């Protein structure tokens, strides 16, 4: 999976897909009341990027629904995964549950259209810190209460704050989540990061009987040397400001026979058995 990073304006969707991404990440900013308002990162962000691009969240969902719906004029077959980078740290912890309810309802109304949409992308909920786990509980409660629990099959969970992996596992156990879990490891492209935690996540992913990590990806990679390093370690995905660079690296002799771009036929919740 090549995840285009910080794709917060509607016009950026095609831009990143044209560069080779088959997944996009966008930031969800909340009001103080826990209502998801806009796709927006804000300052600071990655080096060399404009941090202020944004869209109304519901309008963004309406557009991305078309982009991921077969036979729609806007359909782009390659886009198979949407990573919602949630920003609940900008609201009080007491509002995390309200935020989870709101995002679930907005996806139901504007993306899935309560069963009337054929939009097919998988959804990855990126949660910054384990302390925000009530967001996940609320999201799942809302799907169940609204009568659309089946959409859980399309939704995965990912904690992005580089916290202790055992601590993350403990929270997933509390929530009763034993599958459909991704694990991110990374840092803004402005800084270098070692591989110790990334290697630990990959080791856990590959441990028989360990149910709390199905996929591992590294972020935010802009240098080809770091992309190569991550691929050699065996990551499932790369988040980048430059998907075209990832494409070029994947075509290199060392990687061409080992990796390929994921398609809709590849289940993002299953471990790859090479």
From Swiss-Prot:
<keyword id="KW-0456">Lyase</keyword>
<dbReference type="GO" id="GO:0008081">
    <property type="term" value="F:phosphoric diester hydrolase activity"/>
</dbReference>
<keyword id="KW-0800">Toxin</keyword>
<keyword id="KW-0964">Secreted</keyword>
<dbReference type="InterPro" id="IPR017946">
    <property type="entry name" value="PLC-like_Pdiesterase_TIM-brl"/>
</dbReference>
<keyword id="KW-0204">Cytolysis</keyword>
<dbReference type="GO" id="GO:0046872">
    <property type="term" value="F:metal ion binding"/>
</dbReference>
<dbReference type="GO" id="GO:0016042">
    <property type="term" value="P:lipid catabolic process"/>
</dbReference>
<dbReference type="GO" id="GO:0090729">
    <property type="term" value="F:toxin activity"/>
</dbReference>
<keyword id="KW-0442">Lipid degradation</keyword>
<keyword id="KW-1061">Dermonecrotic toxin</keyword>
<keyword id="KW-0443">Lipid metabolism</keyword>
<dbReference type="GO" id="GO:0016829">
    <property type="term" value="F:lyase activity"/>
</dbReference>
<keyword id="KW-1015">Disulfide bond</keyword>
<keyword id="KW-0354">Hemolysis</keyword>
<protein>
    <recommendedName>
        <fullName>Dermonecrotic toxin SdSicTox-betaIIB1bvi</fullName>
        <ecNumber>4.6.1.-</ecNumber>
    </recommendedName>
</protein>
<keyword id="KW-0460">Magnesium</keyword>
<comment type="function">
    <text>Dermonecrotic toxins cleave the phosphodiester linkage between the phosphate and headgroup of certain phospholipids (sphingolipid and lysolipid substrates), forming an alcohol (often choline) and a cyclic phosphate. This toxin acts on sphingomyelin (SM). It may also act on ceramide phosphoethanolamine (CPE), lysophosphatidylcholine (LPC) and lysophosphatidylethanolamine (LPE), but not on lysophosphatidylserine (LPS), and lysophosphatidylglycerol (LPG). It acts by transphosphatidylation, releasing exclusively cyclic phosphate products as second products.</text>
</comment>
<feature type="active site">
    <location>
        <position position="5"/>
    </location>
</feature>
<feature type="binding site">
    <location>
        <position position="25"/>
    </location>
    <ligand>
        <name>Mg(2+)</name>
    </ligand>
</feature>
<feature type="binding site">
    <location>
        <position position="27"/>
    </location>
    <ligand>
        <name>Mg(2+)</name>
    </ligand>
</feature>
<comment type="similarity">
    <text>Belongs to the arthropod phospholipase D family. Class II subfamily.</text>
</comment>
<feature type="disulfide bond">
    <location>
        <begin position="47"/>
        <end position="190"/>
    </location>
</feature>
<feature type="disulfide bond">
    <location>
        <begin position="45"/>
        <end position="51"/>
    </location>
</feature>
<feature type="active site" description="Nucleophile">
    <location>
        <position position="41"/>
    </location>
</feature>
<dbReference type="GO" id="GO:0005576">
    <property type="term" value="C:extracellular region"/>
</dbReference>
<dbReference type="GO" id="GO:0031640">
    <property type="term" value="P:killing of cells of another organism"/>
</dbReference>
<feature type="binding site">
    <location>
        <position position="85"/>
    </location>
    <ligand>
        <name>Mg(2+)</name>
    </ligand>
</feature>
<keyword id="KW-0479">Metal-binding</keyword>
């Amino acid at each position: 999976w090549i995840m285009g990073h910080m794709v917060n304006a509607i016009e950026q969707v095609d831009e990143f897909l044209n560069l080779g991404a088959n997944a996009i990440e966008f930031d969800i900013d909340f009001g103080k009341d826990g209502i998801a308002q806009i796709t927006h990162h804000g300052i600071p962000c990655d080096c060399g990027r404009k941090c202020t691009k944004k869209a109304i969240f519901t309008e963004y969902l309406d557009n991305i629904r078309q982009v991921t719906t077969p036979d729609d004029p806007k359909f782009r077959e390659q886009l198979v995964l949407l990573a919602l980078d949630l920003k609940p740290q900008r609201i009080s912890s007491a509002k995390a549950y309200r935020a989870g309810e709101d995002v679930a309802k907005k996806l139901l109304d504007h993306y899935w259209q309560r069963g009337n949409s054929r939009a097919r992308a998988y959804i990855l909920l990126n949660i910054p810190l384990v302390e925000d786990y009530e967001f996940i509980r609320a999201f799942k409660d809302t799907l169940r209460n609204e009568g659309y629990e089946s959409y859980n099959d399309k939704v995965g969970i990912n904690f992005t704050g580089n916290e202790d992996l055992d601590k993350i596992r403990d929270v997933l156990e509390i929530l009763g989540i034993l599958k459909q879990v991704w694990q991110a490891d990374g840092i803004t492209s402005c800084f270098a990061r070692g591989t110790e935690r990334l290697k630990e996540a990959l080791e856990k992913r590959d441990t028989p009987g360990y149910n709390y990590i199905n996929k591992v990806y590294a972020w935010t990679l802009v240098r080809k040397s770091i992309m190569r390093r991550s691929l050699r370690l065996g990551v499932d995905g790369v988040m980048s400001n430059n998907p075209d660079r990832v494409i070029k690296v994947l075509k290199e002799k060392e990687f061409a026979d080992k990796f390929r771009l994921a398609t809709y036929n590849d289940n993002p919740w299953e471990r790859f058995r090479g």
